[in-house]
Amino acid sequence: MPYRISRQAYAETYGPTTGDRIRLADTELILEVEKDFTTYGDEVKFGGGKVIRDGMGQSQTSRAGGAVDTVITNALILDWWGIVKADIGLKDGRIVGIGKAGNPDIQEGVTIVIGPGTEAIAGEGHILTAGGIDTHIHFICPQQIETALASGVTTLMGGGTGPATGTNATTCTPGAFHIGRMLQAAEGLPVNLGFFGKGNASTPEALEEQVRAGACGLKLHEDWGTTPAAIDACLSVADQMDVQVCIHTDTLNEAGFVEDTIAAIKGRTIHTFHTEGAGGGHAPDIIKICGEANVLPSSTNPTRPYTRNTLEEHLDMLMVCHHLDPKIPEDVAFAESRIRRETIAAEDILHDLGAFSIIASDSQAMGRVGEVITRTFQTAHKMKVQRGALPEDSSRNDNHRLKRYIAKVTINPAIAHGISSQVGSVETGKLADLVLWKPGFFGIRPQLVVKGGSIVWAQMGDANASIPTPGPVHGRPMFAAFGKALAPSCLTFMSDAAMNDNIQSKLGLKRTCIAVENTREVGKSALKLNSALPNMSVDPQTYEVFADGELLTCEPAEVLPLAQRYLLL
């Protein structure tokens, strides 16, 4: 006779199953399990007296015979494509199976074979996501990498050379020399990395040189002069060499207005940074560019979400980052023109509608590198509280909203930058960059981070203790972050032209280098669950934002989840 246990006892032993609901941390966001790939009564679990033992859940199959290197058991996957319970198999640093793990000699329906060479990670009671992707990094200091990793971000793309004045303001690694040095520095950093060259030039030669030197994209920034001529030249080189172009448009409207920038883009694919405008861009109406089909619009996290403190902290941040002088009235006026409560409030709603598609940090240049995922789900929480359930959701769960928001920090930045064949989702064939979260800490503090199939970061107690759990428990780098294990666990992204020019060998790089691809063929319609194209307008006097004729406005949050309850500040 089969043995029956209560739903609560089952969840406590094997994790939640189909129909179970979970609150994410201290938010109002509720997740419901859509499908369970494991088999009731035949689940695999590691431990004394448990299932993964020789002749039981562990087969005799060798690694060469098909057994996986690692199995993550009974994890609850949250990704853009679904919310499912499954075992996950990892081999050679890649995801090779999502389904039912075990011993096919005695168990039915096994799709992931456990053998003597298989390690086990207990996913029961944990949420599993793809590693986050942050595509707006100012590489000001290498300590950012550890902070990002501690938040669940495993891929960083951007520009910079360290705390140079140019890097403090712009995400550009200018010129072949600096690109080479940053690619060499990446060898010791335990995340995937890609670097943007400076895109501000009116003729192609210097831009092509940077792409051949190893840039994975080009960045147009107003502080270097984002003129229509520079926009056109940069996009022309990008189209020729298949790299993405990111743009920070002209706040002062010196070389033209938003309509002139749209005209200069000529319908070509472009990733617009901080599309609301507080981070920089045509004042006051750059936000309306999110209605263009060729534009991939992103936000940076200082305006995520709109709170009672958002406006107050922005002015000083902006003055420092852009090398402005508070004694010069024109500099102060420049800064103040970028900070508008109306457009920041509208940005919240545009994210909830799926009209803004990506969230990134703007690290140490107004944004916080360790808060990308936190700010994303704070925004989702605020929108549920203020706007209620999405039409696709119900009173039972917020599944569609959760998929929409997780896509903003995983698959969509990967698609935008031509790396989605490698990273950005929990799918077979992709690099095993995975994050395990306890539900009570979702979005704020990962329990464990897997990088290229090996554990790179984890919550860990006193190293001198008799067991791993005694305090102080905090996030620490693990073995995949050290020695020669680091290089095979990580990817460096660059242009196909650089790969063909053998930059990897010329610079002595040991990491796996991958060419970005298909960056010029994507439009907003390719971005998962975030492809809305509203007809946008902005009142030039009041700064009120309208989408399809509807005023977009909301109140600032007074209190947020994923905040002081979790932080000793």
UniProtKB/Swiss-Prot annotation:
What GO molecular function terms would the record report?
Answer: nickel cation binding; urease activity
The free-text note explaining how the cofactor binds reads: Binds 2 nickel ions per subunit.
Q: Which residues bind Ni(2+) 2?
A: K219, H248, H274
Q: Which cofactor does it need?
A: Ni cation
Entry EC number(s): 3.5.1.5
Q: Which GO terms describe its cellular component?
A: cytoplasm
Give the PROSITE patterns listed for this entry: UREASE_1, UREASE_2, UREASE_3
Boundaries of each Urease domain copy? Answer: 131-569
Pfam families according to UniProt: Amidohydro_1, Urease_alpha
Give the free-text PTM comment from the record: Carboxylation allows a single lysine to coordinate two nickel ions.
Report the pathway entry.
Nitrogen metabolism; urea degradation; CO(2) and NH(3) from urea (urease route): step 1/1
**Which cell locations does it reside in?**
Cytoplasm
Annotated binding of substrate, by residue = H221
Q: Which residues bind Ni(2+) 1?
A: H136, H138, K219, D362
Protein family per UniProt = Belongs to the metallo-dependent hydrolases superfamily. Urease alpha subunit family.
State the name under which the record lists this protein: Urease subunit alpha
Q: Which gene encodes it?
A: ureC
